[in-house]
Amino acid sequence: MKKTAMIAALLLVPLVMGFAGGGKAGEGAKKAERLRLATGGNTGTYYAYGSAFGQIVQNKTGIPVIIQSTGASKANIQLIQAGEVEIALVQNDVMDYAYRGVDLFNGEKITDFQTVAALYAEACQVVADPSKGITTIADLKGKNVSVGDAGSGVEFNANQILAGYGIGPNDFNRQNLSFGASADALRDGKIDAFFCVAGAPTTAVMDLAINKTVTLLEIDNAHADAIIAQYPFYTKLAIPGNSYRGNPNDVQTLVIKATLIASPKVDADTIYTLTKTLFDNKAEITAAHVKGAELEAGYAVSGISVPFHPGAEKYFKEIGALK
C-alpha cells in the first residue's frame, strides 16, 4: 500500500504566486499548487533523501511537498505518466529503459517525463551472510537471494551483475523482497544474501548490521569492466569502509545515478525554482542527509539520456553547466 505523508501542509499563497525564475510555461503546463514526490520504500535512501530535500524546498518556496512511499523507479515513472505525482526519484538506467521502451519497459515505451537533475550515486550493494560460506558474488550460485521487488530496477541490476559472474536466472533461489523485507529475511535466516541499489549507507542495511554480522560483497575490476562494457550506464565506485558495522574496508561496486524527474505538465517556473533551490541549499540538504554532499552541477547533467525539463534546462544554462 502506498503511504503518503504531508510535509507541513500550509500553503503560503503569496510565496507560490511569487515563485522566482523567468520563462513561460510549456504547452499544457500549469502553475503547481503542490508537488507530490514519489520516492521508494520507507527504509530506503529515496524516501529519506526525498523527505529531507522536500522539507527544505517547501521551507524556501512555500509550496507543499507531499512525500509518497512507492515501489521506486519503474512505479515512479508510471505514476508521473498517470498524473498521480509531479516529481519523482528514479535510477538513470530505468529512465533510459522507459524512454526507449526496452528491458524493464519492453513494449511499454513512456516519454511523458523529463529530467530535472542527477543527484547522487546509487550503489549496487550485495549484502551477504558470511556464515553461509559466501565471500564473493560467485558464491551466490545455489543460494537463496533476494533481488528486490519483482520487475524493479533493482532486479534488473541484480540480473545483470549475476550474469556477469556466470550466474543465470535458474542458478539460484530467487526471492523478490523490498530492502526492508530482505534485511528482515536475512536476519531470520530465510535468505542468504540480497541486492540493495541505493545510496550508501542505506538505512535497511545499517539497521541489519547492528545485530547481525553481514558482508558487503565486492565487484572486482575484471567483472566490473566486463559489465560496464555491456551496460555503459554503470560506473565503478568504492563504498567507504565502516559504512556498515563489521565492514572496515572500502568495497568496490557498480553505481548508477539517482535522478530527479518531473512531469512536463509542471510549469517551467516551478521546476526552475525547484532546481535552483536544491543547488542553492546544498549545505542544508547535506546536514539533513549525507547524500546531499554529492549535489554538483556537472554531475547533475552528465550521463543523462532523457531530455531536461525546460525549467531545469534554464537553470543549468544560467550557471554554465549546459550550453
Question: Can you describe what each PLM-predicted range is?
Answer:
Residues M1-R34:
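Short, low-complexity disordered leader/linker segments with a strong preference
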Residues G18, Q114-T135, I261-A262:
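Hydrophobic/proline-rich hinge and linker segments of small-molecule sensing/allosteric domains
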Residues E27-Y97, N106:
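N-terminal (or domain-start) structured segment
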Residues A32-K60, P64-V65, E122-D188, S302, ...:
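Bilobed "Venus flytrap"/periplasmic-binding protein-like clamshell domains
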Residues N92-V94, V102-L104, K132, G168-L260, ...:
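Pocket-lining segment of extracytoplasmic ligand-binding domains
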Residues N106-L119, C124, S243-Q252:
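A structural signal for short loop-to-beta-strand junctions that line the ligand-binding cleft
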Residues P130-I137, V266-D269, L322:
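Short helix-loop capping/hinge motifs at secondary-structure junctions, enriched
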Residues L177, A181, D188, A198-L216, ...:
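An extracytoplasmic/periplasmic, membrane-proximal ligand-sensing/linker region
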